[in-house]
């Protein structure tokens, strides 16, 4: 999928893109085998419980994974794009946690801020793939909200680093 979208291996590595296998418990079992406590696994939002089942399951399955970083570049959550066309939610994010509130974060903010020159404005685009494609084309100053709307908190982040941010969203209703 990533090659079909024109992303080079170097770009994929730079953005630390990954894949969540189509398994209900691969991540849960891997983390447990590494000694991570069940409570920690659940607190980070990567493993969930269903309303009607007691057994936990991996939140992301059969998805391209996009690490979401805080303002300092530390991974605090993930976004995932479904590989199957039959999945209702094409994109989904980690649930809100103690560290992550999707309305307060912009994808690629730390990198974009570091790339800003004196004359550059920060560019806000619609999604992960837009940000990554722009970076590969030489525009490292792009960010994206983590949903269908740009929140007030996200706008404040933009204005902190760029007095005239450029908004470049798709023309569709999504």
Question: Could you describe each region identified by the protein language model?
Answer:
Residues 1, 18, 44:
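Short acidic/histidine-centered micro-motifs embedded in hydrophobic/aromatic stretches
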Residues 12-23:
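Terminal amphipathic helices with adjacent charged low-complexity linkers/tails
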């Amino acid at each position: 999928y990533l090659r079909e979208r024109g992303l080079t291996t170097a770009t994929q590595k730079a953005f630390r893109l990954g894949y969540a296998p189509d398994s209900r418990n691969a991540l849960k079992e891997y983390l447990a085998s590494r000694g991570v406590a069940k409570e920690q696994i659940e607190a980070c939002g990567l493993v969930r419980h269903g309303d009607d089942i007691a057994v936990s399951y991996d939140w992301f399955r059969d998805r391209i994974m996009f690490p979401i970083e805080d303002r300092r570049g530390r991974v605090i959550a993930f976004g995932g794009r479904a590989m199957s066309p039959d999945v209702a939610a094409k994109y989904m994010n980690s649930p809100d946690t103690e560290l992550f509130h999707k309305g307060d974060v912009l994808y690629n903010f730390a990198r974009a801020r570091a790339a800003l020159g004196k004359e550059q404005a920060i560019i806000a685009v619609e999604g992960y793939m837009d940000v990554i494609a722009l970076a590969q084309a030489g525009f490292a100053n792009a960010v994206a909200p983590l949903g269908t709307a740009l929140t007030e908190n996200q706008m404040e982040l933009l204005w902190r680093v760029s007095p005239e941010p450029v908004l470049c969203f798709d023309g569709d209703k999504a």
